[in-house]
Amino acid sequence: MYIYRMYNISINQNLEALAKQLYDYWFVQFDFPNKEGKPYKSSGGKMVWNEVLKRNIPEGWHCGNLFEIAKFTNGLACQKFRPKDGETPLPVIKIREMRDGFTADTEEVTPNIPDAVKVFNGDILFSWSASLEVMLWAFGEGGLNQHIFKVTSANGFPKSFYYYQLLDYVDVFKKMAEARKTTMGHITQDHLQQSTIAIPDDKKIADEFEKRISPVFEQMVKLQEEILALTKLRDELLPLLMNGQVSLNSDLSSLLLYYRVPNKSENNERKHHSGNSCGHAA
């Protein structure tokens, strides 16, 4: 069980590294496939100097900002939306949950919050205060707390494109803070507005990237779900094994039936609806 769990973690890390490598190849080195399927820049694709970015970018690209490709919806002050008697609460997603997932210390919020601040597996989250982190969420449904943005598409740009663009730009913010020998306190909407990134005029190249990366994201979420199920199984079985209540035979086999990853049809019962935006400016 431990080996299988660590194996899944290793696979997820490798998948993330491979996806990032492909992103860098296409959108940093600009060797995305040209019309003939050859690497654009390496095959002599025309590059144009951009004065704002201070670098050459492919012809037909421009300098834009993160708001052009993504929407940033801030979470709620969840302490103002505690669950009422009889409600089935949602766990609150704070920066701690982004690191550790849900724990016994995780707070709860009413399920009657706007859909825009409900989080589902596969959503992109960006903690913008104190700890600057971007992640593909895979710890289960929850309610988003303030100091974290839920990042969604703007102007039709796909998830994989705005995820890696944001991931790269967070590194820019961190390097700026390091150069000033200070800690970046938080990222505001103004910081995002002032960001500068290279964006293709025709988003078909971003859509082609999405076709390749979307299955990778789906597999990463599935593996994380399995990791969580195995972790829960470990935490609940170890005390039983230690005090002799179960043994590594048929007792354990029967218990395993109760700890499995939900199948696809069960996961589909939870639909990810998008509601009216309730974003709050940072």
What spans do the regions from the language model cover?
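Sequence-specific dsDNA recognition surfaces
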Residues: 47-55, 64-82, 89-121, 144, ...
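Secondary-structure transition motif
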Residues: 29, 35-36, 74-75, 157, ...
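Alpha-helical scaffold segments that mediate packing/assembly in large oligomeric complexes
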Residues: 21-41
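Flexible loop/turn segments at secondary-structure boundaries
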Residues: 100-102, 133-135, 248
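Non-catalytic DNA-recognition/assembly elements of restriction-modification systems
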Residues: 2-25, 44-77, 203-250, 259-282
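Proline-centric
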Residues: 1-6, 56, 148-159, 175, ...
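A short beta-sheet element
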Residues: 94-95, 113-172, 177-182, 187-192
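Short coil/turn segments at secondary-structure boundaries
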Residues: 37, 79-87, 176-179
